[in-house]
Amino acid sequence: MNDILIKLEQVLEQRKSAKVDESYISSLYNKGTDEILKKIAEESAEVIMAAKDGVNDKIIYEVADLWFHTLVLLRFKEIKVNQITNELSRRFGLSGLQEKAKRNN
């Protein structure tokens, strides 16, 4: 799974230098954080609607869109995929209550 995320990360990085009128991603970068966040909110709502519909293929499709636009945000903010996977690894094996208690200290 990590391989496709790394490949996407590389493409998203390349799109930073693409012409705005030739790249959807470049146009999002050009519009800034608020526009990227609007797309993430839109995709999140679509995941919720797909889940309520109960059709797994729709859920998969919409989650892929959500992950993609989240990756756009990460690249825009100069956050690498491995930083997220490292954080997930750090949390692995901790109960949710343990992880929350660590944040409150």
UniProtKB/Swiss-Prot annotation:
It is found in: Cytoplasm. Pathway: Amino-acid biosynthesis; L-histidine biosynthesis; L-histidine from 5-phospho-alpha-D-ribose 1-diphosphate: step 2/9. Keywords: Amino-acid biosynthesis, ATP-binding, Cytoplasm, Histidine biosynthesis, Hydrolase, Nucleotide-binding. It comes from the Bacteria. It is an enzyme of class 3 (hydrolase). GO terms for biological process: L-histidine biosynthetic process. InterPro entries: HisE, PRib-ATP_PPHydrolase-like. It catalyses: 1-(5-phospho-beta-D-ribosyl)-ATP + H2O = 1-(5-phospho-beta-D-ribosyl)-5'-AMP + diphosphate + H(+). It holds the Pfam family PRA-PH. The keyword Zinc-finger does not apply. Its EC number is 3.6.1.31. GO terms for cellular component: cytoplasm. Its main location: cytoplasm. GO terms for molecular function: ATP binding; phosphoribosyl-ATP diphosphatase activity. Belongs to the PRA-PH family. This is Phosphoribosyl-ATP pyrophosphatase. The lineage of its organism: Bacteria, Pseudomonadati, Pseudomonadota, Gammaproteobacteria, Candidatus Pseudothioglobaceae. The gene is hisE.
